[in-house]
Amino acid sequence: MALKNFNPITPSLRELVQVDKTSLWKGRPLKSLTKGISKTGGRNNQGRITSWHRGGGHKKLYRIIDFKRNKIDISAIVERIEYDPNRTAFIALIKYEDGEYSYILAPQKLSVGDRVISSQDADIKIGNCLPLKCIPIGTTLHNVEMKVGKGGQIARSAGTSVDLVGKDSGYAQIKLRSGEFRLVPLDCKATIGSISNPDQKNINLGKAGRNRWLGWRPHVRGVAMNPVDHPHGGGEGKTSGGRHPVTPWGFPTKGKKTRKNKRTSKFIVKKRK
């Protein structure tokens, strides 16, 4: 989809760049595939902030997405492509031959009227879902499972994809956008193609208020705080913090590795760049 620029008739329109959504469905989502979602304001069940700078934002309905694609060997037709406020990718409403509706992540070049299927014998066609053992090397994939039957977890954001680069000893080797090479069981499923809305990375919100609509509050720098609030705080006049950058709890930031999951490190063939 193309990007949309605006004439600067107001200051906030001068820098505004949006994705053109004219080809998307303009009505409401399918009610049976939505549910309410409550705001947390970045707080956990104890009321403490666990995700800073969150709060407010427009009210949303959560669209129930089928990441598992468990309806095997039943063909479905794409009814429409929709906007989803809960993610950067677009979603597709599909109708199976038995009459059931479902939402899936919409890959690039999927259009209304196309047929998709989840099957071991499916064609290598955009939107089809197959086990990795049935997919030829070199194929571009998205919504890749990490555990058999858990549902897709890798490459679900706008414009993302992974490449299948090898198969060996019961595992498929995939290359992620980060440059990481990872092993995934061959029985895990993946969908053909890359995710829709690749221009998401080029948008410009144009004003602070548009970020507030998305649920983001102002991001306050540590050097602008008091010493009680942040290790960089305080000082007479404007100061630079006086130390290497740290988090509010005093741990080094800006590049320090924070990954703790040693249990799955054996599946990482090559670390990300």
UniProtKB/Swiss-Prot annotation:
UniProt subunit comment: Part of the 50S ribosomal subunit. Forms a bridge to the 30S subunit in the 70S ribosome.
SUPFAM superfamilies recorded: Nucleic acid-binding proteins, Translation proteins SH3-like domain
GO biological process: translation
Domain of life: Bacteria
Listed Basic residues bias regions: 254-273
Function of the protein: One of the primary rRNA binding proteins. Required for association of the 30S and 50S subunits to form the 70S ribosome, for tRNA binding and peptide bond formation. It has been suggested to have peptidyltransferase activity; this is somewhat controversial. Makes several contacts with the 16S rRNA in the 70S ribosome.
Region of interest: Disordered: 228-273
GO MF annotation, one: structural constituent of ribosome
Protein name, as recorded: Large ribosomal subunit protein uL2
PROSITE patterns: RIBOSOMAL_L2 (PS00467)
UniProt KW keywords: Ribonucleoprotein, Ribosomal protein, RNA-binding, rRNA-binding
The keyword Ribosomal protein belongs to this UniProt entry's keyword annotation: yes
Any one of the GO CC terms: large ribosomal subunit
PANTHER family according to UniProt: LARGE RIBOSOMAL SUBUNIT PROTEIN UL2M, RIBOSOMAL PROTEIN L2
Annotated InterPro entries: NA-bd_OB-fold (IPR012340), Rib_uL2_dom2 (IPR014722), Ribosomal_uL2 (IPR002171), Ribosomal_uL2_bac/org-type (IPR005880), Ribosomal_uL2_C (IPR022669), Ribosomal_uL2_CS (IPR022671), Ribosomal_uL2_dom3 (IPR014726), Ribosomal_uL2_RNA-bd_dom (IPR022666)
Record-stated family: Belongs to the universal ribosomal protein uL2 family.
Cross-referenced SMART domains: Ribosomal_L2, Ribosomal_L2_C
Intrachain disulfide bonds: none
